[in-house]
Amino acid sequence: MDINLDALVEANRRYTKEGHVATYIPALAKVNPDQLGVCIYDLKENKEFSAGEYDVRFAIESISKVPTLILAILDNGIEKVFSEVGTEPSGFAFNSIMNMQINHKNKPSNPFINAGAIKVVSLLKGKNDEERFKRILDFYRKIMNDDEITLDTEIYLSERETGDINRSLAYYMKGNGIMEGDVTDILDSYFKQCSVLVTAKDLARLGAVLANEGVMPWNGERLFSVETATVVKSLMTTYGLYDESGAFSVHIGLPSKSGVGGGILSSVPNKCGIGLFSPALDVSGNSVASMKLLKEIADKLKLDIFR
């Protein structure tokens, strides 16, 4: 791969000073904000290229919505999942209930806002949180080829302690017949999936599977269908970066998903998966330095899918 990742990481590290770590979840406030790492899984060479803090573990947070959506599709099929969750941008904050109230919709707008992600968790097979989360964790380990992916109990407890808005979303859906099941049990699985520790390398592998149309490039095994890969990448392109999704598509142009743990997952169809980590965030909850670094990588390698 014709790119000096080490030099790019160091050139963009200064942007970590322009953001702030997430503080509304106490455990995330303890993370060193100066970190920046990247990994690219190149499909053509079937090889990983890494630089910076690419192997530092951090909370996956909202990026978890991507692999969990894939698992829900495997459990239920695309038609069933999207009869229960929409595919439209919400026009409201990621943790808002307003879209369902104002538009009188009987389902969340999309699977990447919190209401939609909670609904997706409720669709997973498993009779309780223990079974459901075991399936989530096993799937994450498989799709990211990392058996060391684990739950961070401290972050999970922080998520649960500060999760009242998510509880309100879940109870609203339950009370209006939008979601079935035990709310507390479903939310426990949701809080846990957000609290799983991954690395930039893990995210690059996840992106590579999506880029490779559902086939894990390290062993050639098909994990999910071409159609599923296409749908998920389309959703990532539309609203994967919270309120910055539109600007991100214009300026960088890659199917991506961010999380307040500082990670960004990107998938470049038929080319590569990219994982980035830098915990200092902008006002929208996206990693400042990771976005700057990703822009440079996309420009130098001509990865923008719209150009």
Swiss-Prot record:
Single GO biological process annotation from the record: glutamate biosynthetic process
Reaction(s) the record says it catalyses: L-glutamine + H2O = L-glutamate + NH4(+)
Keyword annotations from UniProtKB, A to Z: Hydrolase
EC number: 3.5.1.2
Gene3D superfamilies: DD-peptidase/beta-lactamase superfamily (3.40.710.10)
A Gene Ontology molecular function term of the record: glutaminase activity
Chain positions recorded as substrate binding sites: S62, N114, E159, N166, Y190, Y242, V260
Pfam families associated with the record: Glutaminase
InterPro entries per the UniProt record, alphabetical: Beta-lactam/transpept-like, Glutaminase
HAMAP family: Glutaminase
Subunit structure: Homotetramer.
Family that this chain belongs to: Belongs to the glutaminase family.
Protein name: Glutaminase 1
The species this protein was found in: Clostridium perfringens (strain 13 / Type A)
Source lineage: Bacteria, Bacillati, Bacillota, Clostridia, Eubacteriales
GN (gene name): glsA1
